[in-house]
Regions:
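Auxiliary alpha/beta "docking" domains used to position bulky ligands
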Residues: 2-170
């Protein structure tokens, strides 16, 4: 089994609904996601992994860095915490397998309430990661291209689709 197949299997064994391995060329980057964050997200200026935070790189600064990776494991779950926990576990495993620059990202589900909501610093800075849109990835266009499910929700009761990514050097 190849090392990347190991991570695919790991994602599924950790509860992911889907996991696919792609290249950075399969990821759709679009700096307009920054506008969607700025004018569409209730966490703008508050969330600890928000691109509005001082020092957070802009999407157009991050794209060239992310394109240096050789592959990207996309993890899909209907439960945000499962997607994030799987991406963390795979990031850790890949690191110990020798992929020192491995990097995961997902919408944050670490704390029940983000410390940023209270104007405090992140309680889990070693685990907190940026979301797709905060680094300039059009998650809708990307997952559509990969034939994975995602559509805007009309009602809060509709089933959600959450995505995480693990950027790999293998």
């Amino acid at each position: 089994m190849s090392i990347n197949n190991k991570y695919l299997e790991m994602a599924l064994s950790l509860g992911a609904d889907n996991a696919v391995l792609v290249t950075p060329d399969d990821i759709v980057f679009d700096g307009r996601t920054y506008l969607k964050c700025m004018f569409g997200c209730k966490d703008w200026g508050i969330g600890c992994t928000c691109p509005s935070k001082e020092g957070f790189p802009k999407p157009w600064e991050l794209e060239p860095l992310l394109r240096k990776y050789k592959s990207v494991l996309i993890v899909h779950s209907h439960i945000k915490k499962i997607a994030q926990d799987a991406s963390f576990a795979i990031e850790k495993e890949a690191y110990f397998d020798g992929d020192i620059m491995v990097f995961s990202m997902s919408d944050c589900a670490i704390c029940e309430t983000c410390a940023g909501q209270d104007g405090k610093t992140c309680r889990a800075m070693m685990l907190a990661r940026p979301s797709f849109h905060s680094v300039g990835i059009d998650v809708f266009a990307t997952v559509k291209k990969l034939n994975l499910p995602l559509s805007p929700l009309r009602e809060p009761s509709e089933e959600q689709n959450w995505y995480a990514a693990v950027w790999l050097n293998s």
